[in-house]
Structure formats: structure tokens, C-alpha cells
Amino acid sequence: MVSAIVLAGGYATRLRPLSLTKPKALLPVLGKPLMDYTLYSLASSDVDTIYLSLRVMADKVLDHVKQLNLQKNIVSVIEESRLGDAGPLKFINSKYNLSDDVIVVYGDIYAEIDFNKLLEYHQSKGCNATLTATQVEDPSRYGVLITDGHRLIQIIEKPKTPLSNLVNAGIYVFKKELLNKIDGLSISRDFLPKLLVSDTCVSVYPYKGLWMDIGVPRDYMRINLELLTLKYPKGFISQSAKVSEKAELFPPFYIGDNTTVGEGSSIRNSIIGVNNRIGNGSCVEESILMNDVMLGDFSLIKESVIGDEVSLGKWNRVDGAIIGDGVLIHDQVFINRDTIILPDKEVAESVYDKGKIIL
């Protein structure tokens, strides 16, 4: 028997306004919720029970997971108070009969990891804990790892001058008995250092695939567009989508179910979700349009993220903005770079100042 704990209870304040109306784990990544990549990987492994640690908008996560038909035993655990990322491990271990080896993974990271190979590696090294590591371009944003062979020696959180580009990928395997020793809120700041001080063997599993911690909007944009290039270099159009013969499509692109693209419009390096309507003569470039978006004629969306059920009028230009769910933008409106518009707002006048927040 193998148990897994998926941590998906965070507030995701740095991803607002996107996370104000949906939990970070359910933000769409190339047409499906972020958490699904982890859940399907777990479902294809030897894991038999998946524990979901939830807090913020837990009902939305549960409703979604029920529709997945994972054919695994799913147990939801609702955090009644803030427990950090370490607290749920101790709580779940005290309440349920976990397996000897427990996989722990954050629900807000992207990684197509083979959990069976991770378990095999963990068991082969004979350590009580295994941490998954990945290499990144900017390690100063993460927990940087100092290793000796396959063993973890030290973890340094967000150093100004990183000693390496090897960082904590947020996927672990712990021996069940270790979870009783948790007395802090953070795995990387409290629990792992305590294990290392007590000379507990922590092995490091090298992960070489595509990985991203979806912490801020630019991370969210980046993982979507990188995955788009990787999965659909020639583009993808759903069979139920209707794209005008006079529209121009420049790969890579993704056009979801029941979406229409009008004549004279162009889609370039962008992800268009489900039930969207792109008017005539409009352009979408390096952007993400979630679901049920209405884009009027002769408008331009560039380097932006547009939430669900957003309605944009004609002759609009949105340049490098993040727009929350349910926003209404009138005709002939310009939205400048780094603008953030909170959900359900109505915008009738242009936003010329960069970095403005529409509350």
C-alpha cells in the first residue's frame, strides 16, 4: 500500500486576481486544471489512497475531483485553521492509517513525474526521506539545495547569492514515523532542517522534466506557453471549435471546445479555452483566454491573462494585463501593461497608467 498527500489548501495571494474566484490548484494549464496533472500521475502509479489537504474554496476542488473518475481512494481533509504545509502531514498521519512510505506533493506545481520511479529511488537509497530536486534559471526564488552525492546536506531558503541552481521541487517521500516529529508549519524551513540536524538521511531525487512552481502570474503565463510549445508545436483545434477560413493561425496555439474565431482574426502563440467567442478582425497574441470569454470585433489582446466570463467590447487593446473573472470592458478601451483588474468590475474608460489595480 502507498499513500499520497496532495497539499492544496493555500491562499495564493500572489496570484490574485486569478485566485480570488478559483483555487490555484484549479487554474487551467493548457486546457485542464493544474492539479489534474499531479492527480493523473498519482492515479497511474502504485498509490492506492490520495489524501487531499484543503482549505480555501475546498468545495470547488472536491466538486472537480469527483468528476475525474481516478479509480483511487480519495480522502478529503479540510484544514480548520492554517497549518502551513507541514501541519497537514502530522494531522493526517495522526488521523488515518498511512502506508510506511508517504508521498507528499504540492497541488500548485507542474511536474509530470513518475511516482513509481520516485518510490523505487527512495527505497533503493535506504533513507527515511527523499526530496525531489530540479534545476532552475533563478534559484534565488526557491529553496537551494546543498548535496553530497545523493544526500541532502543543507537547504537554504531564497538566498541572495545562490551556491547552486539545484532547488527543492516540492515533491517528497517520507517514512510514516517521521511525520510524528513535525512541530513547525513549514516543511522546508522547519521540518527538513530538523531532520538534517538529527542526522536523518534525506536523499535527493533528480527530476529533469518540465517543472514550475505557479507562484505569480508570470509563472502561470510561462508554464502555459512552454507547455503549449512542447505539446502542440503545430497547434491544436478542438473538433467542436469553429474557426473561420479567413482567420489566421500562427503555431503554437490551442483552441478549446465550442470556441468560435471570426473572419480576419489571428491567433498567435496563445491558449483559447472553452466556449470563447473571438470577433471579426481581432488578434490574440501570447495570451491566455480562459473560458466563456467574449472578445468584440477589431480588438487586440497581447501578453495577457483573461479570466472566465470576461466580456470585452469592440476596438479594445489589452496589453500585458491580468483580468479577473466576470469583468466587463466597454468599447474602445485601452488597458496598459501590468494592470490588474479584480473580478466582476466594469471598465468604461482607458487605463493609461502602468501597473494600476482596478479594485
UniProtKB/Swiss-Prot annotation:
Q: What class of enzyme is it?
A: transferase
Please give the biological process terms from Gene Ontology that the record holds.
Answer: biosynthetic process
Q: Which InterPro entries match?
A: Mannose-1P_guanyltransferase, NTP_transferase_dom, Nucleotide-diphossugar_trans
- Catalysed reactions, semicolon-separated: alpha-D-mannose 1-phosphate + GTP + H(+) = GDP-alpha-D-mannose + diphosphate
Please name the GO terms that the record assigns under molecular function.
GTP binding; mannose-1-phosphate guanylyltransferase (GTP) activity
The UniProt record lists the EC number as 2.7.7.13
What UniProt keywords apply to this chain's record, in alphabetical order?
GTP-binding, Nucleotide-binding, Nucleotidyltransferase, Transferase
Q: Which Pfam families match?
A: LbH_EIF2B (PF25084), NTP_transferase (PF00483)
The membrane-spanning stretches of this chain are none
Can you tell me which family this protein belongs to? Belongs to the transferase hexapeptide repeat family.
Entry protein name: Putative mannose-1-phosphate guanyltransferase
Q: Which organism is it from?
A: Sulfolobus acidocaldarius (strain ATCC 33909 / DSM 639 / JCM 8929 / NBRC 15157 / NCIMB 11770)
Q: Which gene encodes it?
A: mpg1
